[in-house]
């Protein structure tokens, strides 16, 4: 996601924050002061908001760790004012496994609610009597146990709504898939998600108090739009998956026009890239074996990061990406896509009987999908 920067790395999973999160903290400060909070209360309010997003991070790690159990890698976890998302390389093939990964996130919130509830019960620190009577309650640390109990209950229940893009949508689809098929189950859940998005705006219009409508109504509209289009995107992804599984690498394999040697200079790579015939390249060792790959984003980034005078002194081998998994002509395009994403590459060599017979790159796949999708 553009505009997100890394703030931590936990269990080899980068945790990133979108820049708009900073705007949310500014909003917290302005709204707190506008509603009579002193600076100490505003500070505690900000701490509360950070605590909420800590709960969201733990929720996303629930997905990440459960996905790892099924061999699915998590690229990163991104936080924004709309929530968090664990970007997985894919989902388990079996519906029951997908439902386990989906439920793992809300389960974390259920466990957190149990922890806060248990602590509050043991210490008699849960007090629901003054909630909603004043916004100052959010700036009082004495209410945090109660608030985090309620927040985690809300996060669990909200995410279990049986509609995309919530976790409950994936669980609901996994229950429908065995009898209806994955595509039809996804379509039904997509319609539910879009219906929920519209309903959310309608409810916000009638239920949000007038004094809070100036900032809550736009937030509800933005969240609903996100839900609506993400639900649609989920169905598109399933259609793409079906196409990928029906076609093989042999349909897209091509011979590379240009192949770099690992001691070629960056100036040479940049010159070849400018010709526009290819954007992704193989890099070979002196004995003809594959040393790695070098693609347009990396070439441009390297060329910009060093002075023009240095383009002749730096070699391609300093910046190439290694290829850990290759493909064969009989592999499906779905296998190709998964291997491409898991290695964060844009091109893969194709081998048959240990002999290099060609390449397939991401641009070919995108063009193929675009034509196939339009023909449906």
Predicted regions and their residues:
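Hydrophobic transmembrane alpha-helices and their immediate loop junctions
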Residues: 1-376
């Amino acid at each position: 996601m553009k505009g997100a920067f890394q703030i931590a790395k936990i269990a080899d999973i980068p945790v990133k924050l979108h820049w708009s999160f900073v705007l949310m903290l500014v909003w917290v400060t302005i709204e707190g002061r506008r509603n009579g909070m002193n600076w100490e209360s505003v500070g505690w309010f900000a701490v509360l908001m950070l605590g909420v997003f800590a709960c969201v991070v733990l929720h996303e790690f629930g997905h990440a760790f459960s996905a790892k159990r099924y061999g699915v890698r998590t690229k990163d976890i991104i936080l924004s004012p709309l929530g968090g998302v664990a970007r997985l390389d894919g989902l388990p093939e079996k519906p029951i496994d997908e439902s386990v990964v989906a439920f793992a996130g809300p389960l974390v919130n259920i466990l957190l609610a149990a922890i806060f509830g248990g602590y509050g019960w043991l210490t008699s620190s849960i007090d629901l009597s003054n909630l909603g009577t004043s916004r100052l309650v959010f700036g009082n640390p004495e209410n945090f146990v109660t608030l985090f109990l309620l927040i985690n209950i809300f996060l669990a229940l909200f995410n279990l709504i049986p509609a995309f893009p919530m976790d409950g949508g994936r669980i609901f689809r996994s229950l429908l898939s065995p009898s209806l098929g994955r595509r039809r189950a996804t379509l039904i859940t997509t319609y539910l998600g879009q219906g929920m998005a519209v309903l959310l705006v309608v409810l916000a219009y009638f239920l949000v108090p007038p004094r809070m409508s100036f900032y809550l109504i736009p937030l509800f509209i933005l969240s609903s739009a996100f839900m609506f289009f993400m639900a649609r995107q989920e169905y598109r992804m399933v259609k793409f998956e079906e196409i990928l599984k029906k076609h093989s690498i042999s349909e897209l394999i091509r011979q590379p026009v240009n192949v770099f040697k690992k001691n070629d200079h960056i100036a040479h790579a940049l010159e070849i890239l400018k010709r526009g015939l290819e954007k992704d390249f193989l890099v070979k060792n002196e004995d003809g074996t594959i040393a790695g790959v070098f693609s347009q984003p990396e070439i441009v980034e390297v060329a910009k990061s060093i002075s023009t005078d240095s383009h002749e002194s730096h070699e391609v081998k300093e910046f190439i990406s290694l290829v850990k998994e290759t493909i064969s002509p009989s592999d499906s395009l779905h296998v190709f896509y998964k291997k491409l994403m898991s290695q964060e590459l844009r091109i893969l060599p194709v081998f048959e009987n240990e002999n290099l017979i060609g390449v397939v790159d991401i641009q070919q796949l995108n063009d193929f999908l675009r034509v196939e999708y339009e023909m449906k």
